[in-house]
Amino acid sequence: MKRGSKRESGGPLTEEPEPLFSEENRSLQDGNPLDESDSEESQYSGLEDSGTDSSDDEEDHSSEEVQDPGKSPKEIIKVPHRTSKSQADSPADEEDQPNEIKEYENDSSDEEDIRNTVGNIPMEWYKDLPHIGYDLDGRKIFKPLRSKDQLEEFLDKMENPDYWRTVHDKKTGQDIKLTDEQVDLVERLQKGQFGDLNYDPYQPAIDFFTHETMIHPVTNRPADKRSFIPSLIEKEKVSKLVHAIKMGWIQPRKPRDDAPTYYDLWAKEDPNAILGRHKMHVPAPKLPLPGHEQSYNPPPEYLMSEEERLAWEQQDPEDRKLPFLPQRFNCLRAVPGYARFIHERFERCLDLYLCPRQRKMRVNVDPEDLIPKLPKPRDLQPFPTIQSMIYKGHKDLVRCISVSPSGQWLVSGSDDCSVRFWEVSTGRCMKSVVLEGAVKSISWNPNPVLVLVAACVDRSVVLINPGLGDRLLCSATDQHISGYQPPEEEVQQPVTWEEAEGSEYSSGLRLWIKHQKEVKQVTFHARGDYFAVVLPDNGNSQVLIHQLSRRRSQNPFRKNKGQVQKVLFHPTRPFFFVATQRYVRVYNLLKQELTKKLLTNCKWVSSIAVHPAGDNLICGSYDSKLAWFDMDLSTKPYKVLRHHKKALRAVSFHKSYPLFASGSDDASVIVCHGMVYNDLLQNPLIVPVKVLRGHAIHRDLGVLDVMFHPTQPWVFSSGADGTIRLFT
C-alpha cells in the first residue's frame, strides 16, 4: 500500500513501525523546528486540500514522518512537506510545479455534459417551465432562447453544411455538432455493427479441452468422500416417504379422465335426417344485375321522351316495364340519394320468405364426354402409309404435278423448263418436253376423251398432246383441235390463240395462248372444255376463262377485290371459287352474282381444294393453317387444323375416298380422314391419320404440290429437292 493513502481517506494510520531514532525523528529530538507550513491544523484538520494530490505526495520524498512522544511506536504521524506562500508565488518555481489539474479531467462519466449542473434527472419535469433546473448555488438555469421560425430553420438547413450532423441536447437545451467519431458510431449502430471499431467479434476460439491427449491432468484434486458414500440425508427422506405411503398419507395419482370437455351435440342424430335437410335446401335466386337504363349516364335511347314519361305515370305500378324513370347526370357526384332503396329492400325481404322456390335440376356433365370420340386410324384404312416410289429426272424444283383421269400417267412441271410424263406403276419417264421458261402450273384435262395437258410458261399457256395411251384417243384429240372453224367476224379478245407448227408440233405442242402478263395458275372445268387462268396483277384482268372448242377468252369480272391467289371450278354446279389473300368468294356464273364470301381467318391464302360432293372446301395458308369450310353451315371455318410447322403450299381432295392431304415447307405431307355424311344434321368427321415424310428441304422450301390418285388411295407429292414421291 502506498504511503499517504490512509491519510487521505481519513482512516487510522496503520503504517509499518519504523525505527524511533531515524534521521527525521532525530531532528525532532534535537529541537529542530518543523517547517512553517507544517502546522498542527494541517496535520489533523481532516480536510483535503483541493490544490494538492496524493500522487504528488507519493512522488515527493520530502514528506516527513513525526512520532508523537506520547504515542506508541506504531502510531506514526505523517506530515507532508509544504511550501510557503511566498515560494508558491515565485515565478521561478512556477515552471517546476506540475500543471494545475482541471476539475473534470479525470471525470469518467460519459452520460452528463460538463456544462450541465442539473444532474441526470428527467427533463419532462421542466417541459412547461422557462428553466431546466438549478445550479450549485440554487439559481435557476434558464433555457436557451430558440427563436428560429420555419423559414430560418429551412435556410439553416440549406446553407449550413453541418446541419445534418447537428442534434438538439435536451439536458442543456443547445444544438450540438456531432464529431466524425460520433457520426461513425451512429452509422455503425444503424447497420447493426459493434460500436467499437477495434472490437473483433470473430476472434479465434481457444478450445481448452482439445482432441490432443494431455500428459498431465487439468485438475488433480482427489475426489471427495461424499462422492462415493451414500447420502444419509437422502436415506432419511426415502424412509419418510416409505412410512407415509404405508400409513396412507400419500396416495398414488388418479388416472386422468380423457373424456373431452366439449362434445358434439349432434353426434347421435340420425344421418338420414341431416341429408334430408340438406337436400331440401333451395337457395334464393340472385338479384338481376343492373342494366344500361340504371346507369347515371345512360345512352340516349334509354331516356324517355315527354310522351313516354306521361304514359309511364298513367300506368299502374304493376303494368310498368320499369319501376323507375331513367335519368341522366353529368357526373357521379351529382347523383342524389336513391329514394326507393328501403322500398326495394322491403320487397326483397318479402320475396325471400313469401315466394315459393323452385328447384332446377343441375346436369353434371363429364368434360370428357364433350370431347368427340375420334375413331382409331387403323379403323379408317385404307390411306397411304409408306413411300413406294421416287420419280427422279428433274434438275430443279418440281413446282406442279397432275394425274391423268385413268391414273396410269403422271405429268410434272419444273423450274428446269421441262415437262415430264411418267408411268405411275413403273416410275419410267415416258416423254420430256422442253419449254421456253419455268413451268409454274400444270393440269391434265379431266375429260377422259381428250388426251390434253395445259401448262403455264411465263406469259403463255401451252396445250400439249403427250401421245400416251390409246392412239385413237390421241388422234381424236388432234382432230378436235384442228377442226376449229374461225368465226366470220373476228371478236376482240384479251389473249392470242396460236397453233404450234414444225418441231413444236412434232414434240407434242398443239396450241399457244399468249397473255399480256405472266400466268400463275391453270385449272380445267370438270367437262374439260373450259379452263381458267390466274394472272397475278392488281389490274381488273386477274382471272380469264378460256373455251377450248370455240377458242374464246373472256374476263368474268369487271373488277377484282384483292389480289387473286387461286381459282377453281365447282365439280358439279356452275360455281366459281376465287381465293384472294384473306377471303374465298363463290360466284354463280349463270346468274353472274356473288353467292358467298368465306372468311378464312388466315393472313395469306396459298391453295384451295373442293370436295367431290361440292359442299365442303379446304383452304391452306402461308401461316401454317388448314381451314375446313362447310358451306351449308357457315361462312366461317368449321375446323382449323394447325398440324404443320411451316407454310402450306398445296391441298388436295381424293375423288372417291374420304381423304384429303396437305403439303408444307416442313417437307411433310399430312393425310387426314375427312368423311362427309349425307345427313345434313351430322357434321363432317375429320381425323388426322398419317404424317408422310421423305422430301428434303431445299432453299427453305419443302413439298410444293400434292395430288391424289383418281382411283387408288395413293398420294403423289413434288418437292423442292427435284423429286416426285408416291406414297401408297
UniProtKB/Swiss-Prot annotation:
Biased composition (Acidic residues): 50-67
One term of GO molecular function: ribonucleoprotein complex binding
Region (Disordered): 1-114
Keyword Cell inner membrane carried by entry: no
GO cellular component, one term: nucleoplasm
Transmembrane portions of the chain: none
SUPFAM superfamilies: WD40 repeat-like
Record localization: Nucleus, Nucleolus; Nucleus, Nucleoplasm
Repeat region (WD), residues: 393-432, 434-474, 514-556, 559-597, 600-639, 643-682, 698-728
Assembly and interaction partners: Component of the PeBoW complex, composed of bop1, pes1 and wdr12. The complex is held together by bop1, which interacts with pes1 via its N-terminal domain and with wdr12 via a high-affinity interaction between the seven-bladed beta-propeller domains of the 2 proteins. The PeBoW complex associates with the 66S pre-ribosome.
Family stated for the protein in its record: Belongs to the WD repeat BOP1/ERB1 family.
Matches recorded under PANTHER family: RIBOSOME BIOGENESIS PROTEIN BOP1, RIBOSOME BIOGENESIS PROTEIN BOP1 BLOCK OF PROLIFERATION 1 PROTEIN
Protein known as: Ribosome biogenesis protein bop1-B
